[in-house]
Regions:
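Terminal or standalone catalytic/regulatory effector modules within metabolic enzymes
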Residues: 15-32, 263-270, 275-463
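Active-site beta->alpha loop and helix N-cap motifs at the rims of alpha/beta catalytic domains
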Residues: 20, 24-142, 155-159
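Catalytic cores of alpha/beta
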Residues: 129-141, 187-203
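Acidic, low-complexity mobile loops and tails
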Residues: 450-511, 519-527, 531, 540, ...
Length: 548
């Protein structure tokens, strides 16, 4: 959805009587530059010009800001300041692991610059996620100074009974704290759950206009309003405005919706078993399709809860949903669990993302962590300031405003691509990709640029390549369809030089697949010769190097 699409209906939305309008943050920032060729900061400014009555709200991933890794405190601070200056009002601050250490800096910055800091409880179910544990977390966030609390039910698994119990416990423990509830219609329960939450004391619920609602979206605004008003609650919304808003987006949706999305079932009761958010299932389908293994989706859905339990029951929200999801896919495709482990899984197990809700079994943790040094402090304490370095790394002719430096600090390759396009002063923008939904659901946390063709479709190798039989020496095979890289991060040296002696088990290259890096180890000792150029697409089973 382009900014122009939003602005055409923004005044009507502003006059409808909403408590707030979520319009920024999360994946939208990345998508603006990557796919829409728009400046996300300008989008915020334009919406604020029109929406003067309704507070604007954003999704803020704590120390991850809007990205998929932790950022230094100076970047968190300056990003928050500029977001407030450009019109943001309410910051929903959350951490995928519910680790308070990853929230404190973001919350303090929001408060310092005059924003409304909304704390968040990422809701999930597990032996360690209890009402008592959520109340304890809420009290910690209250002590940090949050202005309100959100119960964030990413998968749509919060039942009416559980909502009544949780909201009731929160209101009892924190009687003055406003409670907001966010859910998805994946399981079909969210509207009923909202009613129970409101009866227990919640003052606000998240909805989507009916033409954009349901399944992995929110419950329909009009229906929830009718339910609440039938029970004597006054929502204060203008029904005529809602009708106009719905008609507008219904027409826009018909023009923009990919034909494939019409095939999605309106309710997935399976989420009550596997607890996987709807958007994550879409991403799993996309990842398996890239590996020509879509028929293995049932196996992955069965494996994922086991992997999640192994990794300490993290809530399935960005970035942990991507880490757990890809590791589950690898466990299925490799035929043996944890035979292949992504760098992100290793870093997660070592504590680089924060404290896991439950401890990882020591033997498995040792295997996953490998040679990484475990992190016991707040992960961001290990990071050097990054704002000056980001500014120095940008060519001067690409910077038009300070916001550009922040965009680059968060998404280096995506921002550079956008700046290059912007400097070319194009007369028209590219059409919005038809496979945008699948490709944008979990953008890459990787340090390499995403290669053309790697988004939304299987990466294909060269038309011809050496077979295992033609390869001299012991072949190093690509374990997945993806993109071959000689280094494990942008700007880093090659992991192994041509002709160098390598040891068995030594990491010699990576294959980027499913938007995460997969280290490839030498199957034998000897001298290595690479058969594929850096940055080229490869297919599963293709020899990428030989050891003699």
């Amino acid at each position: 959805m382009r900014t122009d699409d939003i602005l055409k209906i923004a005044e009507t939305i502003d006059n409808a009587g909403y408590y707030s309008l979520e319009c920024w943050g999360g994946a939208t920032f990345d998508v603006c530059m990557r796919f829409l060729r728009e400046n996300p900061w300008e989008r915020l400014r334009q919406i604020k010009k029109v929406c003067r009555k309704t507070p604007l709200q954003m999704l803020f991933r704590g120390q991850n800001i809007l990205g998929y890794k932790h950022y230094p405190d100076d970047i968190v601070d300056r990003f928050t300041a500029l977001a407030c200056e450009n019109g943001m009002d309410i910051f929903r601050v959350f951490d995928a692991l519910n680790d308070p250490r990853n929230l404190e800096k973001a919350i303090s910055c929001v408060k310092r610059y005059g924003g409304h800091a909304q704390g968040t409880l990422c809701y999930t179910t597990s032996p360690v996620h209890t009402v008592e544990s959520f109340v304890r977390l809420a009290k910690v966030q209250e002590a940090m100074g949050v202005d309100s609390l959100c119960i964030k039910d990413m998968a749509g698994i919060l039942t009416p009974g559980a909502a009544r119990e949780l909201v009731g416990a929160l209101k009892k423990a924190l009687p003055k704290m406003p409670i907001q509830v966010h859910s998805h219609m994946t399981s079909g329960m969210a509207a009923a759950m909202y009613m129970a939450a409101v009866e227990a004391g919640a003052g606000c619920v998240d909805c989507a206009i009916s033409s954009l609602s349901s399944f992995s979206s929110q419950p329909p605004t009009e229906s929830v309003v009718s339910i609440l008003e039938s029970e004597g609650y006054d929502c204060g919304l203008d029904r005529a405005a809602l009708t106009k808003i719905n008609a507008y987006f219904k027409d826009l949706k018909a023009k923009r919706q990919p034909a494939s999305s019409a095939k999605v079932e309106p309710v997935d009761a399976g989420v009550l078993v596997h607890a996987i958010p709807g958007g994550m299932i879409s991403n799993l389908r996309s990842q398996l399709a890239q590996q020509d293994a879509l028929d293995r989706l049932p196996d992955v859905l069965e494996e994922l809860p086991k992997t999640r339990a192994d990794l300490g029951y993290p809530p399935l929200v960005t970035p942990t949903s991507q880490i757990v999801g890809v590791q589950s896919v690898l466990n299925v495709l490799a035929g043996k669990r944890y035979q292949m482990v992504t760098d992100e899984t290793r870093r997660y197990a070592a504590g680089y993302y924060g404290r896991t809700p439950a401890p990882i079994e020591p033997k498995l943790q040792k295997k996953l962590v490998g040679k990484l040094k475990p992190v016991t402090c707040r992960p961001a304490d290990l990071l050097e300031p990054g704002l000056v370095a980001a500014a120095d790394a940008l060519p001067p002719n690409t910077i038009k405003a300070e916001e550009d430096i922040l965009s680059y600090a968060l998404f280096p390759e995506v921002a550079l691509g956008y700046f290059k396009w912007r400097n070319a002063d194009p007369k028209t923008r590219e059409p919005i990709p038809a496979d945008l939904e699948a490709s944008a659901s979990s953008p890459s946390p990787a340090a390499h640029p995403t290669p053309a063709g790697a988004s939304g479709s299987a990466a294909k190798g060269d038309a011809t390549f050496l077979s295992q039989e033609e390869t001299k020496g012991t072949p190093v095979l690509a374990p997945l369809n993806g993109t071959f890289y000689r280094s494990d991060a942008l700007g880093k040296p090659k992991m192994a030089e041509d002709g160098a002696a390598v040891k068995a088990g030594q990491a010699v290259c990576v294959v980027e697949a499913m938007k995460l890096f997969n280290p490839i180890t030498a199957p034998a000792a000897g001298k290595i010769t690479f058969l594929v150029e850096h940055g080229k697409a490869v297919t599963k089973g293709q020899p990428i190097a030989a050891i003699a």
